[in-house]
């Protein structure tokens, strides 16, 4: 998360003597769970150039993997899930995919958190999410909706690391 951004939100709410509830959400192996088909559809939905989508698809359509186990490499197979580790494009692709999940989760969600006239439900950096709410029930509802939306895209919230 951007340095001190959550702290700034807290400070503003404390200054105005308003309740602010947080939940820090962690996904299990988030970058490994990006569904390629959903990513391409999301890019199209967000009006990203079809030529650019095709170039990225070509990079990923040729991607193969193999499992190294007991000092030997297994059979090679095509990958249809995950973004490439170490690739400069991976964070951007992940953010596009996560935006789809978050949009589905917070669609029609009423949030009591407002700063500078803007309604805020979450702060994000890569796969780190700070869910925000003005009441405990509202926060629980946000987490439930996020869990449903992420499960639909085969991304799992880590109960152990979410607090």
Residue ranges of each PLM-predicted region?
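Nucleotidyl polymerases of mobile genetic elements and RNA viruses
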Residues: 1-163
């Amino acid at each position: 998360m951007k340095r001190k951004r959550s702290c700034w939100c807290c400070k503003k709410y404390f200054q105005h003597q308003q309740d602010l509830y947080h939940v820090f959400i962690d996904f299990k192996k988030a970058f490994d769970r990006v569904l390629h088909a959903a990513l391409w559809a999301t890019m199209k939905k967000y009006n990203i150039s079809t030529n650019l989508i095709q170039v990225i698809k070509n990079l990923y359509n040729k991607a193969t993997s193999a499992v190294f186990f007991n000092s030997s490499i297994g059979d090679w197979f095509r990958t249809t899930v995950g973004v490439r580790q170490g690739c400069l494009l991976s964070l951007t692709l992940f953010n596009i995919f996560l935006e789809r999940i978050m949009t589905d989760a917070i669609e029609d969600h009423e949030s009591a958190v407002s700063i500078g006239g803007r309604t805020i439900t979450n702060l994000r950096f890569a796969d780190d999410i700070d869910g925000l709410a003005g009441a405990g029930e509202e926060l629980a509802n946000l987490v439930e909706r996020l869990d449903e939306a992420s499960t639909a895209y085969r991304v799992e919230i880590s109960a152990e690391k979410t607090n």
